[in-house]
Amino acid sequence: MTDAAGAAEEVAPEEEPALVHGAVSALSRGQLVVHPTRERYLAVVGALQEDGYQMCVDLTAVDYLAQESRTLPAGVRGQRFEVVVNLLSFTDRRRIRVRVQVPDDDPRLPSLFALYPGTEAQERETFDMFGIVFTDHPDLTRILMPDDWEGHPLRKDYGISRIPVQFKGTPRPPGAGGGETSR
């Protein structure tokens, strides 16, 4: 296996891509980015943890609804969703980004909770907002939206008009007349 610290060259589109733990990698704005397949995602992140990446700083998703043909390293096929994970090594003062493609017709990935317990809320938020299911997550329930909410608001095909807006009483300054609230 290749150590993550050793892959430090930018990969031109026509060159053979560099590999980190069997996953395509490249530099993006000076940061190493690893693109594992969905099937290798958990193994690659586990190997990066063994390389000294002690903390998962962030886990989120991007919906590329109309941009599945965006520029990616050779060997990486774009999908509608991309889960982005940022890892940090305190001892070596290094960061690495993991970007995994997730198809629209089966939006699921293994949970990182067993490796990084701090991802519990991040995976729940990604599930709540994008509908990506993290298998083996201990409590994959909504975290931001009400339990009975339909849909996933950060998906690009989620209709904005579907969001109900509730106007309850608007506070008025004392002495403005009409009572304490208006309706």
Locate the predicted segments by residue:
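Terminal low-complexity/charged segments
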Residues: M1-R183
